[in-house]
Amino acid sequence: MNKGRILSQLPSVDELIKNLEHDKLEKMIPRSVVVEQTRITVDTYRKAILTMDEGSLRDYQIDITSMHDEIKQACESFCSMNLREVINGTGVILHTNLGRSLLSEEIKGQIWEVASGYSTLEIDVTTGKRGSRYNHVVDVLKHLTGAEDALVVNNNAAAVMLVLGTIAKGKEVIVSRGELVEIGGSFRVPDVMEQSGGKLREVGTTNKTHLWDYEGAISDETAALLKVHTSNYRIMGFTESVGLEEIVELGNRYHIPTIEDIGSGVLIDLQKYGLAHEPTVQESVKAGVDIVTFSGDKLLGGPQAGIIVGKRKWIEKMKKNPLTRAIRVDKLTMAALEATLKLYLDEDTAIKHIPTLKMLTENLDTISERASDLFRKLQALDEHLLVRIEEDFSQVGGGSMPLEKLPTKVITLEHTILSAAQMETKLRNFKRPIFTRIRDEKVMMDLRTIREKDFVFIVEALKTVAK
């Protein structure tokens, strides 16, 4: 059978749409979507036929029912939400690709109230005059960090760019070579520096930088000293770096401001909970740093934001920088950030109700109980499915605490028919996508990042996998 004859058997777009009307698809899906997806499907079939060889053409038949099913599936897929909730079984708490920090259930009411109604975003209720959107978080940030003032923009890279562009445009910023980090997505400190208009002045070497390296680079062109916390990697062995207090003292001596990007934004001493020390914002402010920048959606456990705290005279200048408006946060981010920060007013409340902190500090016994509960629900699902509880380690993720290994419990899955890769793919393509990891031909689900409310979806997904 030649290609022309097979192509002539392809139903027209109008024919297919008429048949779909009988299935009442158009009552559920807008007609414009049905028409577009039908055209795409017909075009896909046409291209496939044109690329077939003689052997494939000989036995090929067009299945109208299959075409209908494909169009229906395409329409439903097009109308469904792309950005949706998933289950994180990877054990990476701050999984960048899965949205980093989870917001607390305690604050969703506040976010919805602001999102669904008019709000006090930029109005002073007392005077009735225009106010500043930043005022909603300034006082709580000052209270929590001890800083003189605060400002919030849409992410930490923007915060660093704003700081450098305000303080050092056209002048030099001194930074250690060992701190010229890449912060993800190929964005690097030197690139941010260049975009800000500041001039990078590297000192020291990758593994060793001394105070005299900084001092020797100071000139009339020096606008600031920059300290970058290398939160996403560690240099081990023959190393030396300059302490924050020493850099601040050097800056004070030469009347040069010190800027620190601490990245992760820790507001609680995590050592109290058995974790490695991670520099807190309060420590930086207490050390006398003029400006500190950090993320809202890493260890802070809030929404994506770039938070700037420090000396009032510098932050006042940043508020007047035209770039500030271009990178400002919206009302949803502000509502989520304010509500998250208010949880920090009591440390126990923060640990209990901010998911990132709760997962970081959760003890192994609690995780083991959750693993046992899920194990009992899964073990009898399918004779081909072998379920075990094993020990493993979770990761912090999000470019934070790279050396920290958190003991955890994982559910491992093996199937007598399906490979681990096939199971992983099926779970990932479930209606509530489940992300796992594979090791030694086993699918692993880490209970540190799986919540009890996820269990019902995991059970349903594995029932589907077993079919």
UniProtKB/Swiss-Prot annotation:
Reaction(s) the record says it catalyses: L-seryl-tRNA(Sec) + selenophosphate + H(+) = L-selenocysteinyl-tRNA(Sec) + phosphate
Domain of life, source organism: Bacteria
Enzyme nomenclature, EC number: 2.9.1.1
InterPro entries per the UniProt record, alphabetical: PyrdxlP-dep_Trfase, PyrdxlP-dep_Trfase_major, SelA-like, SelA_trans, SelA_trans_N_dom
Biological processes, Gene Ontology terms: conversion of seryl-tRNAsec to selenocys-tRNAsec; selenocysteine incorporation
Compartment(s) of residence: Cytoplasm
Enzyme's top EC category: transferase
Positions of post-translational N6-(pyridoxal phosphate)lysine modification: 298
Family matches, as HAMAP family: SelA (MF_00423)
Protein name: L-seryl-tRNA(Sec) selenium transferase
Organism name: Alkaliphilus metalliredigens (strain QYMF)
Gene: selA
